[in-house]
Amino acid sequence: MSVEPGKWGVIYNPKAGTRKVQKRWKEIKEYMDSKGVSYDYVQSEGFGSVERLAGILANNGYRTIVVVGGDGALNDAINGIMSSNAEKKEEIAIGIIPNGIGNDFARYWELNLEYKQAVDWIINNRRKKIDVGYCNFYDGEKHQRRYFPNAVKRGIGPRSDKIPDQHKRFCEVKFITFMAATHQPI
């Protein structure tokens, strides 16, 4: 499949963030439209789908893949790109429109959480080359490789990040779910 040069492949993660953050997609889409951005978007369906969708976009020739979500969605998108069959993966730009809870990656790069700034940065081709590391591990069934941008969690961190997303939120406070999650066997 051939994609017109400059067209973005956008992955919207509706599970990222709070309900207020989840409702921002309409505003983000309207802002991109008002700026004349050429894009196709797909919505993730659940755990693991961001990775799969990013791989599909990379394999279909998108050279700019934008994630509307948080740190978890960004990490999954990086894994999808790196695990894809796309040629010249190092030339694929990944953009982030912060729309999650932590957004640590965006904060690290001094991107405020206002989506307009993020869209404008991507439009203006504001890029930084970053290292992508990887970790090989055995998950109890098979050997795996996971990629990560500039930071990695190990031990209870990744497990405790995953559990709240799999459970219903209570009063929109992930902290309560996180505390309960840490007492589950790993």
Roles of regions detected by a PLM:
Residues A16, L74, I101:
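Short, glycine/acidic-enriched loop or turn micro-motifs at the edges of active sites
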Residues A58-N59, D76, S83, I186:
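Alpha-helix boundary/capping detector
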